[in-house]
Amino acid sequence: MAGPRVEVDGGIMEGGGQILRVSTALSCLLGLPLRVQKIRAGRSTPGLRPQHLSGLEMIRDLCDGQLEGAEIGSTEITFTPEKIKGGVHTADTKTAGSVCLLMQVSMPCVLFAACPSELRLKGGTNAEMAPQIDYTAMVFKPIVEKFGFTFNCDIKMRGYYPKGGGEVIVRMSPVKQLSPINLTDRGCVTKIYGRAFVAGVLPFKVAKDMAAAAVRCIRKEIRDLYVNIQPVQEPKDQAFGNGNGIIIIAETSTGCLFAGSSLGKRGVNADKVGIEAAEMLLANLRHGGAVDEYLQDQLIIFMALASGISRIKTGPVTLHTQTAIHFAEQLAKAKFTVKKSEDEEDASKDTYIIECQGIGMTNPNL
């Protein structure tokens, strides 16, 4: 699919791996040859890390593309995509690099393949600086499926920092087109639930303490709902290494989902981990939006590809979201507007409507 190479500046805005994920996925979908320069220029260790490299190699394999300059530490790559193919694709970060970020880059592409796909993704399932796999399965999945597709996410093995070792298998069938979404009516919170986990050598008491601290924190602000956070000991044969963490989800009467999550670190007590997740959830409920701060940017590429006008109501628009919009406009020529919400109940809140006229991408194989 030769044509003029599109130049992408990897150092602007968010300046990290997300620019690489959005731009290479759109390149693959639209058949745009790409040069990305200044990769992760804004980070303490610039250039490609193992998880970015495995994501790039996966995209290359998804479409039999050509990839040059892709090695650890590289700050410039060129990518020339060909036709997207379904079937079985494997990516292994060989570290605790996030399998959820591998999903972010590959899922939009295989939706437009000729046949069903199976993505075998290896790395960290519950890793810092990335969505936890529980977030992907419990929040991202039900919301993104509103675009008119479904996928199956099978967690074979959980993996934690620093070794990774997790494995997730994602199965999905292609679609002809994506439908637009409208997520602007938040409704009221009807349920709060979650899981607090320990894996490996960590004692079960840590899970119970995280859950109890989170419940106490939420109760201060939301008194009329039962908060059901289950402490879980991950089975030995389903978790590699040691880890602990928590995810708490609030569900509303209109089917909106919000989350707060946190991972344990050496020397941080369990209560603090639980409270951090609870406070993140409460912050996401205060802004009046219909999606939380971590879902915003993950929906942008789907809004850009969909046929018709999508609208989502958000809290403050994150830098990740602004970055995703910038590249969706530059590469896919989708049209986005971001406006302060004019609803009376949002007047005192930092609430926005992100609207997109999608490009109506059509699967040429179906």
UniProtKB/Swiss-Prot annotation:
Enzyme Commission number(s) from the entry: 6.5.1.4
Catalyzed chemical reaction(s): a 3'-end 3'-phospho-ribonucleotide-RNA + ATP = a 3'-end 2',3'-cyclophospho-ribonucleotide-RNA + AMP + diphosphate
Active site: H320 (tele-amp-histidine intermediate)
Residues noted as binding ATP in the record, renumbered to the chain: Q104, P131, Y294, D297, Q298, H320
InterPro entries: RNA3'-term_phos_cycl_insert, RNA3'_phos_cyclase_dom, RNA3'_phos_cyclase_dom_sf, RNA3'_term_phos_cyc, RNA3'_term_phos_cyc_type_1, RNA3'_term_phos_cycl-like_CS, RNA3'P_cycl/enolpyr_Trfase_a/b, RPTC_insert
One annotated GO biological process: RNA processing
Disulphide bond pairs: none
GO CC terms of this entry: nucleoplasm; nucleus
Keywords assigned: ATP-binding, Ligase, Nucleotide-binding, Nucleus
PROSITE patterns from the UniProt entry: RTC
Cellular compartments annotated: Nucleus, Nucleoplasm
Gene Ontology MF terms: ATP binding; RNA-3'-phosphate cyclase activity
Similarity-based family: Belongs to the RNA 3'-terminal cyclase family. Type 1 subfamily.
Protein purpose: Catalyzes the conversion of 3'-phosphate to a 2',3'-cyclic phosphodiester at the end of RNA. The mechanism of action of the enzyme occurs in 3 steps: (A) adenylation of the enzyme by ATP; (B) transfer of adenylate to an RNA-N3'P to produce RNA-N3'PP5'A; (C) and attack of the adjacent 2'-hydroxyl on the 3'-phosphorus in the diester linkage to produce the cyclic end product. Likely functions in some aspects of cellular RNA processing. Function plays an important role in regulating axon regeneration by inhibiting central nervous system (CNS) axon regeneration following optic nerve injury.
Stated name of the protein: RNA 3'-terminal phosphate cyclase
Source species: Bos taurus
